From Swiss-Prot:
This is Putative ABC transporter ATP-binding protein TDE_2132. GO terms for cellular component: ATP-binding cassette (ABC) transporter complex. GO terms for molecular function: ATP binding; ATP hydrolysis activity; ATPase-coupled transmembrane transporter activity. Probably part of an ABC transporter complex. Responsible for energy coupling to the transport system. InterPro entries: AAA+_ATPase (IPR003593), ABC_transporter-like_ATP-bd (IPR003439), ABC_transpr_CbiO/EcfA_su (IPR015856), ECF_ABC_transporter_ATP-bd (IPR050095), P-loop_NTPase (IPR027417). It is found in: Cell inner membrane. Its EC number is 7.-.-.-. It comes from Treponema denticola (strain ATCC 35405 / DSM 14222 / CIP 103919 / JCM 8153 / KCTC 15104).
Length: 261
């Protein structure tokens, strides 16, 4: 088990109950999506999965370690977080410095940091961006540089809040390829999204949130063919599920669907 959540609730200082009594588990090596409308509690839930927010009530366990103030450094080595807005994690004078920032905080030596940063720049094919200020980059470039700063830490889990929002199709494909490579290494991906078509094709498992509550969870095909759950959450059924959900097995991609015709 990568992540276990038990009876997790969180109330913001303004009195808003963001999430209420959440119980969930995220399987190791799987891609799990968290879906729901804006304000349903997705981001607040994800913020708990690397200690960005600490539990008020309930427990969060990351790869066998309970999240608390004392375990934050250890937890964040295991679970990296990618914010919806990359400006939240790109704030130094150059891309190179930003990518190495987390390693520096861990007390790693300069030579080790430089070697690790050089490796990830080459792996993601962004060596040409290393001397740029983050403020000179496009949104897509910022997102890829931000995930480089996560991957350089070599976490077992990546938590992504709306990783594809605002990206054009070309950058989205490049970003998906990065996550695919991470997944092929047997690592765990947990992400929120409003793109139900992509989620239906790519996610292994799905959790559905509505008004701070977790109302359903299961494999992607089962969840996205459950009209009652989708209606309650205000989610539109993915096109492939709407057209071919009655098939067994149901096609998960356009290519698979074309093979049925």
């Amino acid at each position: 088990m990568a992540v276990l959540i038990e009876n997790l609730s969180y109330t913001y200082p303004d009195g808003r109950n963001a999430i209420k009594n959440i119980n969930a588990h995220f399987e190791k090596g799987k891609k799990t999506a968290v879906v729901g409308l804006n304000g349903s509690g997705k981001s607040t839930l994800l913020y708990h999965l690397n200690g960005t927010i600490l539990p008020q009530t309930g427990r969060v366990n990351i790869l066998g370690e309970e999240v608390s103030k004392k375990t934050l450094n250890s937890v964040r080595k295991k679970s990296g977080f990618l914010f919806d807005y990359p400006d939240h994690q790109l704030f130094l004078t150059s891309v190179y410095e930003d990518i190495g920032f987390g390693l520096k905080n861990l007390g790693m030596g300069r030579g080790e940091i430089e070697a690790a940063v050089d490796r990830i720049l080459k792996k993601l094919n962004i060596e040409h961006l290393k001397d740029y200020s983050p403020y000179q980059l496009s949104l897509g470039q910022k997102k890829i540089c931000a995930i480089a700063g996560v991957l350089v830490m070599e976490p077992e889990i990546i938590v992504c809040d709306e990783p594809f929002s605002g990206l054009d199709s070309k950058v989205k494909a490049a970003f998906k390829a990065i996550l695919d490579d991470f997944s092929k290494e047997g690592k765990t991906i947990i992400f929120s999204t409003h793109d139900q078509d992509f989620c239906y094709e790519w996610a292994d498992n799905v959790y559905v949130m509505n008004e701070g509550e977790l109302i359903a969870g299961g494999d992607a095909v089962s969840i996205f063919n459950n009209a009652e759950v989708l209606q309650r959450a205000g989610i539109v059924m993915p096109k492939l599920a709407r057209l071919f959900g009655h098939k067994n097995p149901a096609p998960r991609s356009v290519e698979d669907a074309l093979n049925l015709l």
